[in-house]
Amino acid sequence: MFSLASRRALVSGAGAPGGIGIAIAKTLKDLGAEVFITSTTDRIHERAKEIGVTGLVADLTIESDCEALIAKVGSIDILVNNAGMTSQNDPLGADEASDLTGVTLEAWQRGMKRNLDTAFNLTKCALPALRKSKSGRIIMVSSVTGGLMAMSHQPVYAAAKAAMLGLMRSLALDEAKYGITCNAILPGWIETDTQSAHEKLQGMKTPLARNGRPEEIAGLVGWLASESSGYMTGQTLIVDGGNSIQEERAQ
């Protein structure tokens, strides 16, 4: 029931070698899917070659790029919206890391483009193909930040990630008649190549006293992409080591 043989998957935000996106792509491939990954730079071809999938360059903030991407991929059964990042990982995003009074409209729009418009554009362009699948899967990789909690000086990122959940629920309702399910995963502190020392320390304060691994997010994506998850839609799955259930945190 976990086999994805004969299924075709598109995963966004898979450019970082130690990131969640590449772990998702590898898991889907291992389950038998034909996998396409996308990022904004040519390094996506290196990532794709490493795990034996197809890499395509696209700027998902531009609708025409998304249209061209979908045209290249063709039929799609599984869409994983993983593109996005916090402002600290974007060289242009320093003015997003502020309380709301310090956030310019330009900074707000940039953060929304990076973390919300990418999912909107790609999903909109992929829907005709997903509807033809008859059992399509849309999986949003959001965050506990915004989706469940908040972080000081990250109003743009939190708002965008929370908005992904509203989009997910609307899609779950509207696309059910086509056999499409849509769900979201909310990762907590995950150890990736771009994780800061502060983030790594926070992960050690969870009840499980460690950071999560990209493969632990990828495994859940694999299940959501499979036949076994067919009766689940419009739901959020929290993967944070129990961090959100504790009232007191270790010092």
Q: What does each model-found stretch correspond to?
A:
Residues 110-132, 172-173, 177, 226:
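Amphipathic alpha-helical dimer-interface segment in Rossmann-like NAD(P)H-dependent oxidoreductases
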Residues 222, 233-251:
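Short C-terminal tail/terminal secondary-structure segment
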Residues 13, 17, 99, 103-105, ...:
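Catalytic loop of short-chain dehydrogenase/reductase
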Residues 86-109, 132, 153-156, 194-196, ...:
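Conserved mid-core segment of classical short-chain dehydrogenase/reductases
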Residues 135, 176, 181, 232-234:
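Short, small/polar-rich loop/turn modules that mediate ligand/substrate recognition or access, typified
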Residues 2-36:
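Canonical Rossmann dinucleotide-binding motif of NAD(H)/NADP(H)-dependent dehydrogenases/reductases
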Residues 206-217, 228:
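A conserved structural motif in NAD(P)-dependent oxidoreductases
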Residues 85, 98-120, 139, 164, ...:
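Catalytic Tyr-X3-Lys loop
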